[in-house]
């Protein structure tokens, strides 16, 4: 890092991994890469990038918003011509399918400030991807994997678990990063399902879950008033009493409710 004399930018959510052991663990979790095109978001100084390339992917596309950091990768680009390329862009606005061919795996230490928005974007085009191996702030990972009746369970949990198998692999202490963040991080693996667990319109489900979890302490009968004019019919068809609170419903029950609104 000292070689480039670049200070990480808090505005871009930059926290770089110091430990090569951690980068190895992350890439090993992604499994075989030789037959896959890989996307990395925010390669930074290249610690994770080098480890990905060491596992011989079919190709690696790195997306980096910081123009100064893009310049740090000239040596890697020369060493891996035809296999590694870096695009200077905001990952939130990149159209991945225009830049890379399937099959695609994503391996990334996601910038804190865009991690949630980026994951939601990917969920909406989930069939493009084979697997994700991702590092989030622990609190975001907690929300993704949360189960019913837990404090972190919400709209993000429902949508993620409808579309994917998700597993928390390990947590990482702040001391393993530069600069040192104030929070722990978590690495999760995400495997998109061939089809949704339950048949449901995703737009209707998202509208429903966001509305009721915005009033998560209210009983469903009350929180649904702002979502549908068929509250009682929807509850009856979904076999719900209306006295439940949003956190009590399973993913399947949310899908039944959305289908009957």
Curated annotation (Swiss-Prot):
Enzyme class (EC, first level): transferase
Stored SUPFAM superfamilies: S-adenosyl-L-methionine-dependent methyltransferases (SSF53335)
Function text: Specifically dimethylates two adjacent adenosines (A1518 and A1519) in the loop of a conserved hairpin near the 3'-end of 16S rRNA in the 30S particle. May play a critical role in biogenesis of 30S subunits.
EC number: 2.1.1.182
Protein name per UniProt: Ribosomal RNA small subunit methyltransferase A
InterPro entries the UniProt entry points to: KsgA/Erm, rRNA_Ade_diMease-like_C, rRNA_Ade_Mease_Trfase_CS, rRNA_Ade_methylase_Trfase_N, rRNA_adenine_dimethylase, SAM-dependent_MTases_sf
Enzymatic reactions: adenosine(1518)/adenosine(1519) in 16S rRNA + 4 S-adenosyl-L-methionine = N(6)-dimethyladenosine(1518)/N(6)-dimethyladenosine(1519) in 16S rRNA + 4 S-adenosyl-L-homocysteine + 4 H(+)
Alphabetical keyword list: Cytoplasm, Methyltransferase, RNA-binding, rRNA processing, S-adenosyl-L-methionine, Transferase
């Amino acid at each position: 890092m000292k070689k480039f004399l670049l200070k990480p930018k808090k505005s871009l959510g930059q926290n770089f991994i110091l430990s090569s052991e951690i980068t190895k663990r992350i890439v090993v979790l992604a499994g075989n890469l030789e037959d896959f095109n890989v996307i990395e978001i925010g390669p930074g100084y290249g610690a994770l990038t080098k480890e990905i390339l060491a596992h011989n992917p079919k190709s690696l596309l790195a997306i980096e918003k910081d123009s100064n950091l893009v310049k740090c990768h000239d040596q890697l680009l020369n060493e891996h011509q035809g296999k590694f390329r870096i695009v200077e862009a905001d990952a939130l606005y990149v159209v991945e399918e225009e830049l890379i061919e399937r099959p695609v795996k994503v391996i990334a230490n996601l910038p804190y400030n865009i991690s949630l928005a980026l994951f939601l974007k990917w969920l909406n085009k989930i069939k493009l991807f084979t697997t994700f191996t991702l590092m989030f702030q622990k609190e975001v990972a907690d929300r993704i994997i949360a189960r019913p009746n837990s404090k972190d369970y919400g709209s993000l949990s429902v949508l993620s678990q409808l579309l994917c198998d998700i597993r928390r692999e390990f947590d990482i202490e702040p001391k393993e990063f530069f600069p040192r963040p104030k929070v722990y991080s978590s690495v999760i693996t995400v495997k998109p399902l061939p089809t949704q667990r339950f048949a449901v319109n995703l737009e209707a489900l998202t509208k429903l879950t966001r509305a009721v979890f915005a009033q998560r302490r209210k009983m469903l009968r009350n929180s649904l008033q702002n979502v549908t004019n068929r509250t009682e019919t929807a509850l009856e068809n979904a076999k719900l009493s209306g006295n439940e609170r949003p956190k009590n419903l399973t993913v399947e029950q949310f899908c039944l409710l959305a289908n009957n609104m």
